[in-house]
Amino acid sequence: MKYTRLIGTVIAFCMAVPLFAQQYKATIPYRMVGEKMVIEMKVNGNARPFIFDTGGRTALTTKACQALQITATDSMKVTDVNNVESYYKTTRIENLTTPDDVINFKNAPSLIINEVKGWECFGVDGIIGSDLFASTIVSIDSQTKNIIVTSAEKPSTVSLRKMLNFTKEGGMPIVNVQIAPVSNITVLFDTGSPSLLSLIESDFERIKPEASMEVVSEGYGEGSIGVAGQADKASSYRVHIPLLSVGATKFRNLTTHTDKHPYTLLGVKLLQYGKVTIDYPRGRFYFEAFQPDNEINNQCNNFDLTVKDGDLFVSTVWSSTK
């Protein structure tokens, strides 16, 4: 399913600060719904479902704001997944609390967005993004289906050998990975993306002469759905990558596709292969792989599907280039 993204730097959107300064450790369980991580947070005491999205900003739908009697206080410019810039209303959530009541993010800033097409099946009121956790350390464990949020007085105890530094300002988990033999690419770790890797066209064109990649098919169809709407139909490529390295962890024989996002995305499927810890204040990304070497060999259909107005449609048709 196509997905929604609210791209932007955390630093540009004022941070929520936990209510207390002492050490804390909160647990947020999650469940997978249609390749999305769905969590519950308490909004002014009311438990509400959200998509957990490390590549996005915290946001409430207009419908949720009406139900919770939350009003707009300001507006700001946002760039969505399709690089479309629009102005959106913003608000402050007086109390945004973890489900175990351990952390209360006071006056948490939130965008106000319209209901996004295709979200009906998720049954959520919005997005919890990286901006909310800017002063914390977040660990995501797919084996326990828990997100652990801790205070950041001390760095993570995970080995520095498993650590990648953030490569850009702004507090988003943007790091460098490698495509064999020598190509470095900058990726955004984005739990809102359903793939292991989604390669932007500019990265594909830049590294194509030096990387060991093969175009296996070409597709034409609908673009990704962003908060400003759906992108125009466009062509894209399916690409076979013999070796992708995330730190010391290797992923072999991966098939991905090109897209037009602002960044190449390292998606939620990474969690199937290891535990992720993000130290936001220090700009550190840790990946503790279950296995150091992983054979992917993902199978791809000749078409992609999407949901539109409650019905299932073919969104992209792929044809062989051989």
Predicted stretch roles:
Residues 21-322:
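Pepsin/retropepsin-fold aspartyl endopeptidases
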